[in-house]
Amino acid sequence: MALAQIEIANRTIAHSTDTALNRLKWIRRNKDLQDLSYQNIKLNFSNQMLASLSEAIQISTKEKEKDDDIFYWAEGSLAFGKVKETDTSSKKKIYTDGITIGADKFTVGDGIKGLAFRFSQNDVKVGTAGSKLDANTYNLTYYSTAPVKDDRRFLDTIIGVGALRYDISSVLDGSKLNGNRNGRQIYGTLKIKEEIKKDDHTLIPAAQIDLGYTLLS
């Protein structure tokens, strides 16, 4: 059960970071478009709160006249999988659904900066006795990118904070034990990449540093 809590914390940071980096990459590829607002949330969420958020975002975006200087976007995600039993942990079935909403704008020097908020629900079944872990996570992420050299080398920066809420149900010797736990997170990423074009080919070498810290009460 302890490892499942750690895995959720790590996965939450990874999802929040990857979503922001993917947004920056998408903008660079489509920067010539007049409207860089984007939605990718046409998913059937099992969680009622996520489903309501998704519907509200789509309706409000259609009805709202966008600011020409600010671009709004949203993205939904679903993930599920299994982890086999090891010498130190029981097998686990993992299911995660989440939604991210964000807004960004261009900065002086052809850079980009923005903020994104992500909410997700994680359901983990541990072992075969009926133990399970439910977790809600909330993350606020600042992201930016700026050209370092011409329009070929970029430095991406991610800084974020998060909160976690665990509801734990453990089955031990036939008895069910319930509890809850809270957590706080801080994380950051620096990524530098360069586009090297030669003939009809493009090579994109990149280096990335990730840091994250989670404190569980």
Predicted regions mapped to residue ranges:
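Long, low-complexity, polar and repeat-rich extracellular regions
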Residues: M1-S77, I101
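Membrane translocator/pore-forming domains, dominated by Gram-negative outer-membrane beta-barrels
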Residues: M1-E7, R11, T19, D67-S217
